[in-house]
């Protein structure tokens, strides 16, 4: 299969939408990471997503829509869930809801009685879904377990000749996947951190929201409710090690010639890394998160690199999502001075 690159022109997106209508898989941009789009009501198309990614069959898929009205056919929506969608959609929030009997393929749900939905803030994504005329599944458009793609080039690296097309809308803005909140139960639970934070959810809901993202792993015989909970995710082939700001100067003393550092600009300046490559994470939590997967992918492709040392961020705001993804990429391996 030859993979075609589409621009975000009207004609290109309509052509990409027809491919999805016809059961093909097309990667598409969102504000978080690039997704792998296929008709969520076509089991043959859904299977192609699992094959392209090498994704375990019990890892549920997120359904992606262009309009919240599309959900009513598939799920039961509480007043609280609808309030979240009204406030945060389009945006970086995925909501888990109870399905209506027989309305969602078990390939999407992993056999659960719930399904996750998202309405992305990217115009090209929503236009593509409208062109396809159906809700689409939208897992990250990377080989399963590897760092998520934040550019069309990242998607091409993993998916060339495995999928029908890629819609290129440049780099994503957020850089990590959406927040996942389980609204199928009485007390909402965050299962994956993202740009939408626990305090923001609690402010809208006016109720307690449990953050389970530090204890969200599940047993090997249990189907996870959300992606990222059960299997290794976000991990390059290279060794990744986290480090704290207070350990930076000690780390500099033990860096091997083929080690590299990913850190904020002030940290790179403090470490004075004249003899080592360094990947800038910018000056803010937002720029750091935007650049995390791009840096991991860049160094993973360099055969000369041995270890990637990455600065941890303060666990506030989107910094919590940054540390979550970094911890998984590193297998929770931290530098010890």
Spans of features found by a protein language model:
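Active-site-adjacent structural elements in enzyme catalytic cores
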Residues: 1-337
């Amino acid at each position: 299969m030859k993979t075609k690159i589409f621009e975000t022109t009207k004609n290109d997106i309509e052509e990409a939408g027809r491919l999805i209508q016809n059961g093909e898989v097309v990667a598409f941009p969102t504000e978080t990471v690039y997704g792998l789009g296929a008709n969520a009501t076509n089991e043959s198309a859904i299977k192609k997503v699992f094959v392209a990614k090498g994704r375990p069959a019990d890892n549920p898929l997120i359904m992606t829509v262009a309009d919240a009205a599309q959900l009513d056919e598939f799920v039961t929506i509480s007043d609280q869930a609808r309030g979240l969608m009204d406030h945060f959609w389009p945006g970086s929030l995925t909501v888990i809801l109870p399905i209506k009997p027989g309305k969602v393929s078990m390939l999407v749900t992993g056999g659960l009685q719930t399904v996750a939905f998202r309405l992305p803030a990217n115009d090209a994504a929503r236009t593509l879904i409208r062109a396809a005329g159906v809700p689409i599944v939208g897992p990250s458009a990377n080989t399963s377990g590897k760092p998520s793609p934040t550019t069309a080039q990242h998607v091409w690296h993993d998916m060339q000749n495995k999928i029908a097309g890629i819609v290129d809308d440049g780099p994503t803005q957020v850089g990590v996947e959406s927040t996942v909140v389980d609204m199928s139960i009485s007390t909402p639970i965050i299962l994956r951190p993202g740009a939408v934070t626990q305090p923001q959810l609690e402010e809208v809901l006016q109720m307690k929201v449990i953050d389970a993202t530090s204890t969200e792993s599940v047993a090997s015989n249990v189907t996870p409710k959300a992606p990222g909970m059960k299997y290794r995710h976000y991990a390059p082939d290279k060794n990744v090690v986290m480090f704290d700001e207070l350990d930076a100067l000690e780390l500099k003393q033990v860096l091997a010639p083929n080690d590299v550092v990913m850190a904020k600009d002030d940290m790179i300046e403090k470490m004075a890394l004249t003899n080592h490559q360094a990947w800038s994470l910018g000056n803010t939590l937002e720029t750091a998160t935007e650049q995390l997967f791009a840096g991991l992918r860049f160094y993973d492709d360099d055969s000369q690199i041995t270890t990637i040392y990455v600065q941890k961020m303060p666990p506030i705001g989107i910094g919590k999502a940054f540390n979550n993804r970094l911890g998984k990429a590193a297998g929770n391996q931290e530098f010890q001075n």
